[in-house]
Amino acid sequence: MIITLIILVIIILLIIIFNKRAVPAFLYHQVNPISNVTPELFEEHLKVIKEYKMNTITISEFYNKEVPTNSILLTFDDGYFDNYKYVFPLLKKYNMKATIFLNTLYIMDKRETEPEIKDNNTVNLEAMKEYIKSGKATINQYMSWEEIKEMYDSSLIDFQAHSHKHMAMFVDTKIEGLTNKEKMEAPELYLYGELQDNFPVFPKRGEYTGRATLVKKEFFKIFKDFYEKNIENKITDKNEILKKSQEFIDENKEYFSVESEAEYRKRIEEDFSENKKIIEKNLGNEVKFFCWPWGHRSKATIKVLKELGVVGFISTKKGTNSMKANWDMIRRIELRNYNVKKFKINLLLARNLILGKIYGWIS
């Protein structure tokens, strides 16, 4: 009984001592009336931050050790127009800071008309259709450089790298299923080159995670023709369908290859350098933080990007960050549909170094 009491007292003391000794980071994407996080809900989050007298800082300030006790990072991925339309006015209203990680392929110089805001899957699919067609993917559903510059000049928003294209790659040739053109999204369009039913679905990851499995695009129609002639409406068992499909894939290895180490490095270096160059050209800032697309991390790519000047890597791994952070993996808590109560609970857990670490371990 006494030992249990002593342990309990020690735990309570540790929780008290380490309260406000962590730097939680929260992750958003879109904030608009049709997203899971509406402007009204986001404002409630800011009110909670204000209620607990927390200091919002940018990722650059965090790295430069400009970190008051009780600090928090607000981060946004991709660079959607609603970040300018809804988020920026609220940050100004509450005098709070944020960091936005940009995909530069989709950003136009100047906006001519204000768009009707769409969900991010629709936005990115439309952009990729144009990219496949013309090689250009600027779309008014993303912020313009004029808007981004206005935000940057306010000193409230830091802008850093999130890759140029934010696309995927195949990592294996083991078939997982078949495409449904009505459900295909931007990464699938990028990989297949067109939206079609009955293309083989292979495992994929973010482009920055390593060496890609390369598939010649003509194979997809060859496979589709084989499937529709020999399997569709003839075999009903799912496992048998996959077995027969895999046998055909394995018989056609000439359509597949794996990137060399040099090809992988070249691809990463070119995409990141373009991302960095465009941001720095438009803002005059220093880009040295990289946010993993989809949170897909790679130790090998960390090494490559460090050679290109990256000093900090931003993940989607839950938990919190100590004031002396692990810059190979800044943890973030993703907010897709957190109500105010859930936001408050996560905030209070993650600003405590001990509780935040436990949260990260069990998540």
What kind of region is each of these model predictions?
Residues 111-115, 121-211:
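A substrate-binding/cap region within the structured catalytic cores of diverse enzymes
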